[in-house]
UniProtKB/Swiss-Prot annotation:
It comes from Klebsiella pneumoniae subsp. pneumoniae (strain ATCC 700721 / MGH 78578). Its EC number is 2.8.4.3. GO terms for cellular component: cytosol. It comes from the Bacteria. Residues 378-441 form the TRAM domain. Residues 143-375 form the Radical SAM core domain. Monomer. [4Fe-4S] cluster 2 binds at C157, C161, C164. This is tRNA-2-methylthio-N(6)-dimethylallyladenosine synthase. The keyword Cytoplasm applies.
Length: 474
C-alpha cells in the first residue's frame, strides 16, 4: 500500500521551495507520495512562517485539527518545521505533546532519520540547529514541475532589521557553492525549465565559493546562470538595497535573460523610521539605486515591501513614504501593518501608533500602489509582450496563461503544445489582476538558443570529485 505525505505550507517562496524538497526527499528515501487530503496521510508536515501576526497561535490551531486525526490513527506522524518551529522549539511539544517531530529550516534534510527514529522507538525528535549549508548536500536531484523553478542559493540574513525574525529563525547568511547552484539549474533545464528564480532572504548578498576556491559575486553568478542553454529568463528574490552594488546593475545592461522586473524592499520613505528599523540605508540612497537601474534598463518595473505604523511613525513620516512611492512609481507592493515579532528589538519599542491610523495608512498606500499598477498595465495595451506559457488559464481551462517579464498574468487562446514555450502576445485588454492577449509569434520564429540542448550541457560539465560527488564546472 502506498504511503502518503501531506505538507501544509505557510509563508514565503523559500518555504515553498523547502516544502518541495521535503516531498522529493521523502519520496526518494521512504516512497511517500504527496496527497492534498490530510486524512489520507501517514505523515503530516506543517511548514510554518513567523512573519505574520499571531503566527504561533495559527500553528496551534492547525495542530489542534490534526490532533483529531492522530486520535483516530495513533501511528500517524506529525511534524512541525519552518521558522515558528525554529523559534518555539520545545514549547511546541509542551503545548502539543502529540507532535512527533520539530525541525528547523536548516535541518529538513534530516527528516528521513527523524521519521525512522519516531517509527522505531516512538520518542519525539527536536532538531532546530543551524548546521551551515549541510542540507543542500543531502537533498535528491531536483524535479521540475513546469517551465519555471525556484532555486535556493543561500540561507539566512546578517542584517538584523529590528522588526525581523529571520536571522534568529534561519541563522546568518550562508552561501551555496557556485558549482552546486549551476548544476541544479542545468538539471532543471534538462527537464524543460526555461525560467529560474534565485532565492535567498538576502539574495544579492550571495558570496559563494567557485570551483577554483575563489569567492564569486552575485553578479558573477547571474551571468553564469544566463549562460546555461535552455534558461531564457532569470528572476531573483529577495534583495536588500545595501547589497545592490553597481556590478549587479551592470548585469542589467548586458544580460537580456535577467528580466526587467525587480522586487527591492524599502519598508519606509522616512529616514528616521528607516533608522529605527535598522535598515542601514536612506530613502535617497534607495532612489539612487533605482535611477541607475533605469539608466541601465529603462523599461524595468519595481515592486517593494512596506511596513506602516512602525513604532514612532508620524503622519509626516508616512507622507514621506507616499512621496517615495510616487517618485519611484512602484508597480506593486507587499504592504503590512506593523506587528511585533517576539524576540526582536522592535518588540520592545512602544507601539504608539493608533490602530485606526495604521489601517487608514495601509489603505491609502495600497490604493496608490493599485492605481500605479493599473497605469503600468494600461501602458502595455497594444504592445507585444513575450510570455512564458505556464499552463491552462485559471479563468478558462480552454485558454492558456503565462507571465510577462514584468510579472503580469496574461490569458490568451492557444494550443496545449505551447505550454513550456515562449510566445509573443499582443495585449488587447487590461483587467485588475490580469491582461488579455492574442498570439502574434511562436517560439519557432524567435531565434532562441538551440545550438545545444540542456542535456548536453550536463554531459559536458558534470565532473566528480574524489568522493564521487557530482559537481558542475562551467
Amino acid at each position: 500500500m502506498t504511503k502518503k505525505l501531506h505538507i501544509k505550507t505557510w509563508g514565503c517562496q523559500m518555504n515553498e521551495y523547502d516544502s518541495s524538497k521535503m516531498a522529493d526527499l521523502l519520496d526518494a528515501t521512504h516512497g511517500y507520495q504527496l496527497t492534498e487530503v490530510a486524512e489520507e496521510a501517514d505523515v503530516l508536515l506543517l511548514n510554518t512562517c513567523s512573519i505574520r501576526e499571531k503566527a504561533q497561535e495559527k500553528v496551534f490551531h492547525q495542530l489542534g485539527r490534526w490532533k483529531l486525526l492522530k486520535e483516530k490513527n495513533p501511528d500517524l506522524i506529525i511534524g512541525v518545521g519552518g521558522c515558528v518551529a525554529s523559534q518555539e522549539g520545545d514549547h511546541i511539544r509542551q503545548r502539543a505533546h502529540y507532535v512527533d517531530i520539530i525541525f528547523g529550516p536548516q535541518t529538513l534534510h534530516r527528516l528521513p532519520e527523524m521519521i525512522n527514529s519516531v517509527r522505531g522507538n516512538r520518542s519525539p525528535v527536536v532538531d532546530i540547529s543551524f548546521p551551515e549549508i549541510e542540507k543542500f548536500d543531502r537533498l535528491p536531484e531536483p524535479r521540475a514541475e513546469g517551465p519555471t523553478a525556484f532555486v535556493s542559493i543561500m540561507e539566512g540574513c546578517n542584517k538584523y532589521c529590528t522588526y525581523c525574525v529571520v536571522p534568529y529563525t534561519r541563522g546568518e547568511e550562508v552561501s551555496r557553492p557556485c558549482d552546486d547552484i549551476l548544476f541544479e539549474i542545468a538539471q532543471l533545464a534538462a527537464q524543460g525549465v526555461r525560467e529560474v528564480n534565485l532565492l535567498g532572504q538576502n539574495v544579492n548578498a550571495w558570496r559563494g565559493e567557485n570551483y577554483d576556491g575563489t569567492t564569486g559575486s552575485f553578479a558573477d553568478l547571474l551571468r553564469l546562470v544566463a549562460a546555461i542553454d535552455g534558461i531564457d529568463r532569470i528572476r531573483f528574490t529577495t534583495s536588500h538595497p545595501i547589497e545592490f552594488t553597481d556590478d549587479i546593475i551592470d548585469v542589467y545592461r548586458d544580460t537580456p535573460e535577467l528580466v526587467s522586473f525587480l522586487h527591492l524592499p524599502v519598508q519606509s520613505g522616512s529616514d528616521r523610521v528607516l533608522n529605527l528599523m535598522g535598515r542601514t540605508h536612506t530613502a535617497l540612497e534607495y532612489k539612487a539605486i533605482i535611477r541607475k537601474l533605469r539608466e541601465a534598463r529603462p523599461d524595468i518595473q519595481i515592486s517593494s515591501d512596506f511596513i506602516v505604523g512602525f513604532p514612532g511613525e508620524t503622519t509626516e513620516d508616512f507622507e514621506k513614504t507616499m512621496k517615495l512611492i510616487a517618485d519611484v512609481n512602484f508597480d506593486m507592493s507587499y504592504s503590512f501593518i506593523f506587528s511585533a515579532r517576539p524576540g526582536t528589538p522592535a518588540a520592545d519599542m512602544v507601539d504608539d501608533v493608533p490602530e485606526a491610523d495604521k489601517k487608514q495608512r495601509l489603505y491609502i498606500l495600497q490604493e496608490r500602489i493599485n492605481q500605479q499598477a493599473m497605469a503600468w498595465s494600461r501602458r502595455m495595451l497594444g504592445t507585444v509582450q513575450r510570455i512564458l506559457v505556464e499552463g491552462t488559464s485559471r479563468k478558462n481551462i480552454m485558454e492558456l496563461s503565462g507571465r510577462t517579464e514584468n510579472n503580469r498574468v496574461v490569458n490568451f487562446e492557444g494550443t496545449p503544445d505551447l505550454v513550456g514555450k515562449f510566445v509573443d502576445v499582443e495585449i488587447v485588454d487590461v483587467y485588475t489582476n490580469s491582461l488579455r492577449g492574442k498570439i502574434v509569434r511562436t517560439e519557432a520564429e524567435m531565434g532562441l538558443r538551440i545550438a545545444e540542448s540542456p542535456e548536453s550541457v550536463i554531459a559536458r560539465t558534470r565532473k566528480e570529485n574524489d568522493l564521487g560527488v557530482g559537481i558542475y564546472q562551467p
